[in-house]
């Protein structure tokens, strides 16, 4: 029976879902039943009969009519759905649900009689934009901060410093203290898990330890012991320690400091590929200016994309949302794995459920951005031509010449997506207005990185 003979009635449902009612003629339900008997006769083992040679009456008696009907219906449902989405050109996502449930459908299924099945499935969304031109947005402009050059030079000096022992003075800010310590909670006197050490190097810099610890060590002399009061911050990683007061018995066992190299041409050669300090400063300035420019562009485009999403009209299908949530969780797992963590033991079922729940808002936002750009490409007929794609694929392939297992089809698709996104964002900038807004004072400077 061809799919063209199916009578189909489709009704849109909320959440980018489609209800599809299919009228199945009697002859097709009978054909599925006959096919099920043939299928089971070839696979079932009955004493005294060869496979495929079991008489029909014996097969029905041994297996029971319910099993045969269930097999027939299962095959029928699968075949009808495949034929329906092909006939109606339905872009379905995932597997459909049978309205009323499979068990109820099985009860009403009689081979040789007409049958009506209502499927419900997520379908690809159809995003539209209320407008594409004249969008307005505000974005932070990132300025080059010359003071960051000196900060980066100081960081390099610290990395190249020589550690030497300290004699004849007390511990000071910036020193390296070798301490033994034991911590207990002030409220119940219990020992702090992980809060003790026989010997540990501690940089005496603000923020290295919980509040009160560094301040307590500063001013001590090698051989001194003292008890220091500390406070665990409210955002401390270990939940049971958050906000609690603690005391640490600290012994200063040794004291060291860093001798920084002179800020001169020799330092520049040691710290970089530059020959002089002046060249190193120029190189750092260029990097910071380029970084500020990239971040400014990124801020502008993020703001424009947010403005475009505000114009988006779409219903997100749950199938796509869950797929994007899984992608985010897998990315998190991959990041942990790259850091050397045991993902299998770390990612318990409870943690995965929590991650999936907390990742949902980001997943939905990512989908909206992607769909907004797709709608823009459709509305403005923006696309990438083959010569541009070929040139970029050639360039990327050359950069990945040492890599193995490169799928050329996936690489080409990734190149197309990147080029199209760049073109769409560029088009948005040309056809929208972005005004500068004051930086968020609570936000760390982007050039700190």
From Swiss-Prot:
One GO term of the biological process aspect: protein unfolding
Keywords: Cell cycle, Cell division, Chaperone, Cytoplasm, Isomerase, Rotamase
GO MF terms, alphabetically ordered: peptidyl-prolyl cis-trans isomerase activity; protein folding chaperone; ribosome binding
PPIase FKBP-type domain residues: 174-261
Protein localization: Cytoplasm
Location of region: Disordered: 430-449
Segments of skewed composition (Basic and acidic residues): 437-449
GO cellular component, one term: cytoplasm
Record-listed E.C. numbers: 5.2.1.8
Keyword DNA-binding attributed: no
Listed InterPro entries: PPIase_dom_sf, PPIase_FKBP_dom, Trig_fac, Trigger_fac_C, Trigger_fac_C_sf, Trigger_fac_ribosome-bd_bac, Trigger_fac_ribosome-bd_sf, Trigger_fact/SurA_dom_sf
Presence of the UniProt keyword Lyase in the record: no
Top-rank taxon: Bacteria
Reaction catalysis annotation: [protein]-peptidylproline (omega=180) = [protein]-peptidylproline (omega=0)
Pfam families xrefs: FKBP_C, Trigger_C, Trigger_N
Family statement drawn from the similarity comment of this UniProt entry: Belongs to the FKBP-type PPIase family. Tig subfamily.
HAMAP family recorded: Trigger_factor_Tig
Protein role: Involved in protein export. Acts as a chaperone by maintaining the newly synthesized protein in an open conformation. Functions as a peptidyl-prolyl cis-trans isomerase.
Record's comment describing the protein's domains: Consists of 3 domains; the N-terminus binds the ribosome, the middle domain has PPIase activity, while the C-terminus has intrinsic chaperone activity on its own.
Protein's UniProt name: Trigger factor
Taxonomic placement: Bacteria, Bacillati, Cyanobacteriota, Cyanophyceae, Synechococcales
Gene: tig
């Amino acid at each position: 029976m061809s799919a063209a003979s199916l009578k189909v009635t489709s009704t849109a449902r909320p959440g980018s879902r489609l209800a599809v009612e299919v009228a199945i003629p009697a002859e097709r339900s009978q054909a599925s039943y006959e096919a099920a008997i043939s299928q089971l006769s070839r696979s079932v083992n009955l004493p005294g009969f060869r496979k495929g040679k079991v008489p029909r009456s014996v097969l029905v008696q041994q297996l029971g009519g319910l099993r045969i009907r269930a097999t027939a219906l299962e095959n029928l449902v699968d075949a009808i759905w495949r034929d329906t989405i092909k006939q109606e050109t339905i872009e379905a996502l995932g597997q459909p649900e049978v309205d009323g449930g499979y068990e109820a459908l099985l009860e009403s299924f009689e081979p040789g009689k007409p049958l009506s099945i209502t499927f419900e499935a997520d379908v690809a969304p159809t995003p539209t934009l209320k407008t594409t031109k004249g969008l307005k947005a505000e974005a932070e402009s990132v300025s080059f901060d010359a003071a960051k050059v000196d900060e980066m030079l100081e960081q390099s000096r610290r990395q190249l410093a020589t550690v030497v022992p300290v004699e004849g003075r007390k511990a000071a800010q910036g020193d390296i203290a070798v301490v033994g310590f034991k911590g207990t909670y002030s409220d119940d006197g219990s020992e702090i898990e992980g809060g003790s050490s026989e010997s540990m190097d501690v940089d005496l810099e603000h923020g290295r330890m919980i509040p009160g610890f560094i301040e307590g060590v500063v001013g001590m002399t090698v051989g001194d012991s003292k008890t220091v009061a500390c406070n665990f911050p409210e955002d401390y990683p270990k939940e049971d320690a958050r906000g609690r007061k603690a005391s640490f018995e600290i012994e200063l066992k040794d004291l060291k400091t860093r001798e920084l190299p002179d800020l001169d041409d020799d330092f520049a050669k040691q710290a970089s590929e530059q020959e002089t300090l002046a060249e190193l400063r120029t190189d750092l300035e260029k990097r910071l200016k380029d970084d500020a420019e990239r971040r400014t562009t990124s801020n502008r485009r993020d703001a424009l994309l947010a403005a475009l999403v505000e114009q988006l009209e779409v219903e997100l299908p749950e199938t796509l949302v869950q797929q994007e949530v899984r992608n985010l969780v897998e990315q998190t797992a991959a990041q942990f794995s790259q850091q050397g963590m045991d993902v299998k033991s770390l990612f318990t079922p409870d943690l995965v459920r929590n991650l999936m729940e907390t990742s949902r808002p980001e997943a939905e936002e990512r989908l909206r951005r992607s769909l907004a750009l797709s709608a823009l490409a459709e509305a403005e007929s923006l696309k990438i031509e083959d010569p541009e794609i070929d040139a970029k694929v050639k360039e990327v392939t050359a950069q990945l010449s040492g890599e193995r297992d490169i799928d050329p089809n996936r690489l080409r698709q990734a190149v197309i997506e990147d080029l199209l996104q760049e073109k769409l964002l560029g088009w948005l900038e040309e056809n929208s207005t972005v005004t500068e807004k004051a930086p968020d004072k609570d936000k760390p400077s982007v050039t700190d990185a």
